[in-house]
Each structure stands twice: as C-alpha cells, then as structure tokens.
Amino acid sequence: MAKKSMIIRALRKPKYKTRQNNRCKLCGRPRGYLRDFCMCRICFRKYASQGLIPGVSKSSW
C-alpha cells in the first residue's frame, strides 16, 4: 500500500518544481528512469524487444 501511495503522490503536480520525481508511467518504478521515453529500463527493454517503441532497434556491431 505504501508503494501505491508513493506512485500517486509522484504523479500529482508538485507545489514546487524541485519536488518532482521521475517515475515510470507504466509500472511506477523510481530507479533506472529513461527521460526520453518516460519509462524505466525494465519496461523499456520489454517494449523495445517486442517492437512497440518506434525508432528503437537492438544494436549489433
């Protein structure tokens, strides 16, 4: 329950700009956040491997 309240609190518009927390829009994870995609690294990997993120492909060299 504590995690759910933290997610809801992070999604609300903060009174001050410095109080803003970056959280994944899909799962609410606070760590490993990728700003460009607004999701955590785990969700990014899952959706990128399924091909659901346009312009992202697995790199190989």
Curated annotation (Swiss-Prot):
InterPro entries: Ribosomal_uS14, Ribosomal_uS14_bact, Ribosomal_uS14_CS, Ribosomal_uS14_sf
UniProt-recorded Gene Ontology molecular function terms: rRNA binding; structural constituent of ribosome; zinc ion binding
Keywords in alphabetical order: Metal-binding, Ribonucleoprotein, Ribosomal protein, RNA-binding, rRNA-binding, Zinc
Residue runs in coiled coils: none
GO BP annotations, alphabetical order: translation
Cofactor annotation remark: Binds 1 zinc ion per subunit.
Entry superkingdom: Bacteria
GO cellular component, one term: cytoplasm
Binding site for Zn(2+): 24, 27, 40, 43
Pfam families, per database record: Ribosomal_S14
Keyword Cell cycle recorded: no
Cofactor entry: Zn(2+)
Stored SUPFAM superfamilies: Glucocorticoid receptor-like (DNA-binding domain)
PROSITE patterns: RIBOSOMAL_S14
Cystines in this chain: none
TM helices/strands, residue ranges: none
NCBIfam families reported in the protein's UniProt record: PRK08061.1 (NF005974)
Assembly mode: Part of the 30S ribosomal subunit. Contacts proteins S3 and S10.
Alphabetical list of PANTHER family matching this protein: 30S RIBOSOMAL PROTEIN S14, SMALL RIBOSOMAL SUBUNIT PROTEIN US14M
HAMAP family assigned to the protein according to its UniProt record, in alphabetical order: Ribosomal_uS14_2_B
Function: Binds 16S rRNA, required for the assembly of 30S particles and may also be responsible for determining the conformation of the 16S rRNA at the A site.
UniProt family annotation: Belongs to the universal ribosomal protein uS14 family. Zinc-binding uS14 subfamily.
Name under which the protein is recorded: Small ribosomal subunit protein uS14
Native organism: Borrelia garinii subsp. bavariensis (strain ATCC BAA-2496 / DSM 23469 / PBi)
Gene name tied to this protein: rpsZ
